[in-house]
């Protein structure tokens, strides 16, 4: 998002409508310009953002930490959007010393006039954005860099196996609209009608997720195989009780009290899998939402709870 005015993100009917990502190139060995190379591509993220969080998890699952450097924006978003203010725990922008993420967008396209979103997959060879759509970036991380991944065990990790693709695509489509984006449509609604409609959809989505996990033959959504669907849902669910319940008014229920199978799945991923635990920063998450969205929380007070953020496994 590029500013703090929530009403600017909603339509006149009070509904929040997510912007379509505009940079959609794909890295591949066969691409004319964007081939996989070590240290060429840089990932710009926010630890607060669930969409960017997906890319951090897959980067770690695939052993790309020494292939694709990461740069983190600060947790506080002001009128100029995401920034590289180190007082807000940013790493800074070592490539260009940019003050704001928007500077990268204008470097890639001087006429860019949309929101300045994360994640951003940046090409330091051509000084441009390759892709800013998280769903496509995690697919690239899953298979496009295999030839430069040194760890054999991580190289063979496949989060989008051919045998499960139909089911993965089906679940992704359903849960994107109801849960992943549903919490935003609820929280950024500017009319009671829009809020009430969307919050019900969120909990319908959670009900289905609970059932999918109840029927699963293994620890993950699709049995014994960790897939991108687990990753995509984790980044929303891990934020649900700490932020979305109170900040986005998704308070018909909580994960820990009303969804035992989701809660068990969440605890297992968070406490047993370093790629999930080590990329989850609750300071960034809580402070960003509660102190950046001033029209939702004008006093900028960040709640202490829940304690713990994720129940112990």
Curated annotation (Swiss-Prot):
<dbReference type="GO" id="GO:0071555">
    <property type="term" value="P:cell wall organization"/>
</dbReference>
<dbReference type="GO" id="GO:0005634">
    <property type="term" value="C:nucleus"/>
</dbReference>
<comment type="function">
    <text>Active as '1-Cys' thiol transferase against beta-hydroxyethyl disulfide (HED), as dehydroascorbate reductase and as dimethylarsinic acid reductase, while not active against the standard GST substrate 1-chloro-2,4-dinitrobenzene (CDNB). May be involved in cell wall organization and biogenesis.</text>
</comment>
<comment type="similarity">
    <text>Belongs to the GST superfamily. Omega family.</text>
</comment>
<protein>
    <recommendedName>
        <fullName>Glutathione S-transferase omega-like 2</fullName>
        <ecNumber>2.5.1.18</ecNumber>
        <ecNumber>1.8.5.1</ecNumber>
    </recommendedName>
</protein>
<dbReference type="InterPro" id="IPR010987">
    <property type="entry name" value="Glutathione-S-Trfase_C-like"/>
</dbReference>
<dbReference type="InterPro" id="IPR040079">
    <property type="entry name" value="Glutathione_S-Trfase"/>
</dbReference>
<dbReference type="GO" id="GO:0005737">
    <property type="term" value="C:cytoplasm"/>
</dbReference>
<dbReference type="Pfam" id="PF13410">
    <property type="entry name" value="GST_C_2"/>
</dbReference>
<dbReference type="Pfam" id="PF13409">
    <property type="entry name" value="GST_N_2"/>
</dbReference>
<keyword id="KW-0963">Cytoplasm</keyword>
<feature type="domain" description="GST C-terminal">
    <location>
        <begin position="161"/>
        <end position="289"/>
    </location>
</feature>
<dbReference type="InterPro" id="IPR036249">
    <property type="entry name" value="Thioredoxin-like_sf"/>
</dbReference>
<keyword id="KW-0961">Cell wall biogenesis/degradation</keyword>
<dbReference type="GO" id="GO:0004364">
    <property type="term" value="F:glutathione transferase activity"/>
</dbReference>
<dbReference type="InterPro" id="IPR047047">
    <property type="entry name" value="GST_Omega-like_C"/>
</dbReference>
<dbReference type="GO" id="GO:0005829">
    <property type="term" value="C:cytosol"/>
</dbReference>
<dbReference type="InterPro" id="IPR016639">
    <property type="entry name" value="GST_Omega/GSH"/>
</dbReference>
<feature type="active site" description="Nucleophile">
    <location>
        <position position="49"/>
    </location>
</feature>
<keyword id="KW-0333">Golgi apparatus</keyword>
<dbReference type="GO" id="GO:0045174">
    <property type="term" value="F:glutathione dehydrogenase (ascorbate) activity"/>
</dbReference>
<dbReference type="GO" id="GO:0098869">
    <property type="term" value="P:cellular oxidant detoxification"/>
</dbReference>
<keyword id="KW-0539">Nucleus</keyword>
<dbReference type="InterPro" id="IPR004045">
    <property type="entry name" value="Glutathione_S-Trfase_N"/>
</dbReference>
<keyword id="KW-0560">Oxidoreductase</keyword>
<dbReference type="GO" id="GO:0005794">
    <property type="term" value="C:Golgi apparatus"/>
</dbReference>
<dbReference type="InterPro" id="IPR036282">
    <property type="entry name" value="Glutathione-S-Trfase_C_sf"/>
</dbReference>
<keyword id="KW-0808">Transferase</keyword>
């Amino acid at each position: 998002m590029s500013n703090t005015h929530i009403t600017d993100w909603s339509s006149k009917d009070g509904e929040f409508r997510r912007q379509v990502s505009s940079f959609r190139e794909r890295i591949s060995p066969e691409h004319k310009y964007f081939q996989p190379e070590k240290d060429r591509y840089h990932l710009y993220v926010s630890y607060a953002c669930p969409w960017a969080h997906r890319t951090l998890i897959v980067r770690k699952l695939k052993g790309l930490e020494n292939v694709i450097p990461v740069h983190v924006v600060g947790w506080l978003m002001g009128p100029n959007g995401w920034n590289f203010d180190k007082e807000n725990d940013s790493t800074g922008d070592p490539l260009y010393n940019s003050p704001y993420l928007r500077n990268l967008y204008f470097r890639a396209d001087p006429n860019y006039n949309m929101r300045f979103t994360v994640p951003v997959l940046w090409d330091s060879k051509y000084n441009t954005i390759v892709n800013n759509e998280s769903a496509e970036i995690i697919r690239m991380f899953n298979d496009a860099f295999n030839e430069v991944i040194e760890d054999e065990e991580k190289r063979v990790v496949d989060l989008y196996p051919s045998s499960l693709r139909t089911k993965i695509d089906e679940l992704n489509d359903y849960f994107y609209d109801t849960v992943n984006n549903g919490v935003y449509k609820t929280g950024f609604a500017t009319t009671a009608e829009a809020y009430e409609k969307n919050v019900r959809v969120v909990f319908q989505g959670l009900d289905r997720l609970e059932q999918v996990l109840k029927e699963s033959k293994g620890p993950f959504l699709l049995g014994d195989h960790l897939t991108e669907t687990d990753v995509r849902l984790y980044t929303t669910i891990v934020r649900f009780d700490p932020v979305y319940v109170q900040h986005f008014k998704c308070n018909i229920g909580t994960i820990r009290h009303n969804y035992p199978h989701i809660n068990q799945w969440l605890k297992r991923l968070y406490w047993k899998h370093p790629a999930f635990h080590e990329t989850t920063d609750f300071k960034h998450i809580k402070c960003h939402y509660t102190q950046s969205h001033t029209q939702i929380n004008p006093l900028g007070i960040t709640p202490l709870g829940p304690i713990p953020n994720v129940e112990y496994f």
